[in-house]
Amino acid sequence: MVTLTFLLSAAYLLSGRVSAAPSSAGSKSCDTVDLGYQCSPATSHLWGQYSPFFSLEDELSVSSKLPKDCRITLVQVLSRHGARYPTSSKSKKYKKLVTAIQANATDFKGKFAFLKTYNYTLGADDLTPFGEQQLVNSGIKFYQRYKALARSVVPFIRASGSDRVIASGEKFIEGFQQAKLADPGATNRAAPAISVIIPESETFNNTLDHGVCTKFEASQLGDEVAANFTALFAPDIRARAEKHLPGVTLTDEDVVSLMDMCSFDTVARTSDASQLSPFCQLFTHNEWKKYNYLQSLGKYYGYGAGNPLGPAQGIGFTNELIARLTRSPVQDHTSTNSTLVSNPATFPLNATMYVDFSHDNSMVSIFFALGLYNGTEPLSRTSVESAKELDGYSASWVVPFGARAYFETMQCKSEKEPLVRALINDRVVPLHGCDVDKLGRCKLNDFVKGLSWARSGGNWGECFS
């Protein structure tokens, strides 16, 4: 274990990285505080993890409202960063593909005509302006939803040590504080700060970013399953594209790259992502369903229950959540950082609002470690299954850009013991492993008992065998 190198975010505040400038959150028609991204939903809600957050409140089987006889006593948020440019390696790959098409095509027919003059200008890794605004909106929504607590509380905030994750936390704070300052009923107007930034390293335990489980990191299962499914649906698209781009020879992987560009180009074009990229019109609605399922397969067999060590990557966070909900020391020997979780300054147990910022892959592992998708049958490797058929699981429903999970404890007049509830992107996910009620909740002690797999360390020992 390397020496502790967490950063107190006071330094970030002093350096001016957290902007206090007013924002026009919610004023754009495509992306709003309440509903998220709602433009071209037949396409944009099928971009897998590259979909911008959209509210699943209309997909509820039970109400997400707080029962009248209950009050929220604690809330934990786990958030993905906002919309970003492609990763550095993929940005280079996409640019190379566009350049090759332009160099080899003798004609650009039909909907592919735009490629003749398309100029690849996407950056790499960082949030787009739209992605920044997503997190401002998320901070506003969080304050509004939990106003009864937030008026008098300063949330404790952590972030994994990636620039886009840290920036997402800062933008969330901007939105949260904007909403608080606009609330005449707020009694504690102190601004939150990112109190802990956990380094991302193969040698540093980090519950918000996988990396230390050697056997898991070497696994190629998710990529293999995704490649096999791509081989089932991409050839027809490839043939059509080559017909419209004579002189060009594409691979199945190139087809997926062109589909990826639909989202990445859209979220980078304007600050509100209101202009749908011309890449999007190259594919049919049915093809977008297959693309969305491809991404769901990759996450399930890469980081979820489809990978023997997938859920194990979420054990550490699960045990941190248990500690926070029960106000007791962390009991874990997997990916938690013992130096951090044993220090009240870096892991307090007396807060009532916690906010953590992470990545999509780690969030998938965490959700499966928590058993939230225990009702999801193993995904078919050959045929598309909908989110409803998979008990609410799909990449776009679970980990879109700006995804957020709320874990609540509530005290109700009809119950002596606190109740626990989980919401993912505004959809109540009924708990598993405990005596769940009609509102998807379990009593706190029963919920903790139901997490016996994570509490015992699961199969973490296989990481190094």
From Swiss-Prot:
Gene3D superfamilies, alphabetized: Phosphoglycerate mutase-like
Reaction equations catalysed: 1D-myo-inositol hexakisphosphate + H2O = 1D-myo-inositol 1,2,4,5,6-pentakisphosphate + phosphate; 1D-myo-inositol 1,2,4,5,6-pentakisphosphate + H2O = 1D-myo-inositol 1,2,5,6-tetrakisphosphate + phosphate; 1D-myo-inositol 1,2,5,6-tetrakisphosphate + H2O = 1D-myo-inositol 1,2,6-trisphosphate + phosphate; 1D-myo-inositol 1,2,6-trisphosphate + H2O = 1D-myo-inositol 1,2-bisphosphate + phosphate
Record-level GO cellular component terms: extracellular region
GO molecular function term, any single one: 3-phytase activity
InterPro entries (UniProt xref): Acid_Pase_AS, His_Pase_clade-2, His_PPase_superfam, Histidine_acid_Pase_euk
Thermoactivity: Able to withstand temperatures up to 100 degrees Celsius over a period of 20 minutes, with a loss of only 10% of the initial enzymatic activity.
Glycosylation, residue list: 104, 205, 228, 337, 350, 374
pH dependence: Highly active from pH 3 to 5 with 4-nitrophenyl phosphate as substrate, and from 2.5 to 7.5 with phytic acid.
Disulfide topology: 30-39, 70-412, 213-463, 262-280, 434-442
Broad EC category: hydrolase
Subcellular compartments: Secreted
PROSITE patterns: HIS_ACID_PHOSPHAT_1, HIS_ACID_PHOSPHAT_2
Domain of life per record: Eukaryota
SUPFAM superfamilies for the chain: Phosphoglycerate mutase-like
Biotechnology comment: Phytic acid is the major storage form of phosphorus in plant seeds and, thus, in seed-based animal feed. Phytases are therefore of considerable economic interest.
Subunit-level organization: Monomer.
Function: Catalyzes the phosphate monoester hydrolysis of phytic acid (myo-inositol hexakisphosphate), which results in the stepwise formation of myo-inositol pentakis-, tetrakis-, tris-, bis-, and monophosphates, as well as the liberation of inorganic phosphate. Myo-inositol 2-monophosphate is the end product.
Family: Belongs to the histidine acid phosphatase family.
Protein name: Phytase A
Organism: Aspergillus fumigatus (strain ATCC MYA-4609 / CBS 101355 / FGSC A1100 / Af293) (Neosartorya fumigata)
Gene behind the chain: phyA
